[in-house]
Amino acid sequence: AIACAAAPGLRGPSAFNGAALSTPAKSSSAMKMSFESEIGAQAPLGFWDPLGLLADADQERFERLRYVEVKHGRIAMLAIAGHLTQQNTRLPGMLSNSANLSFADMPNGVAALSKIPPGGLAQIFGFIGFLELAVMKNVEGSFPGDFIIGGNPFASSWDSMSSETQASKRAIELNNGRAAQMGILGMMVHEELSNQPYITNDLLGASYTFN
């Protein structure tokens, strides 16, 4: 059973009045129940928190974790798309003239990290930091992960949707992001184990050359 939150506090008894009870703290089970109806608590797992990250969490804590989940899901979806694109096509030209390194010379997947010159890595991390600190700001009071980047060209289309449709699309994004996080992790593991990251190809017997 889920443990209850801290027991109610007591004020010490006075010579002039009895002990006064404070308002009972909200139990962990009540907290859990309050999150079971949130977007993302859906089939097939429903509300699933095996690590207890939401134990005794308030709404602010939940929204922080949801923000992180949405962001990581989006990054993982981009990583999957980039991995597949890099496997099939490369940009023309040079990645680094000083290192005499062309885009065509770059390996795919995790192996690419060891080939990027230090100056290139610095640019990548600097750009990510700039986006994180100055551009991708969550809209105050909105769903976690709602960014406004120079105005939203799709705002009118989104606003015209019913609340049910918006909730459905948010749930789809969460599910796709969760699948992508597991997918890119699986590809990275299989790349390191056998240099064959595309498990579906292996299962179907579709041959490919990786790096």
Curated annotation (Swiss-Prot):
Signal peptide: none annotated. GO terms for cellular component: chloroplast thylakoid membrane; light-harvesting complex; photosystem II. Residues 1-33 form a transit peptide. The keyword Manganese does not apply. It is found in: Plastid, Chloroplast thylakoid membrane. It is a multi-pass membrane protein. One of its GO terms (biological process) is photosynthesis, light harvesting. Induction: Levels are increased up to tenfold when transferred from high intensity to low intensity blue or white light. The chain crosses the membrane at residues 75-95, 116-136, 177-197. Belongs to the fucoxanthin chlorophyll protein family. This is Fucoxanthin-chlorophyll a-c binding protein F, chloroplastic. It comes from Macrocystis pyrifera. The gene is FCPF.
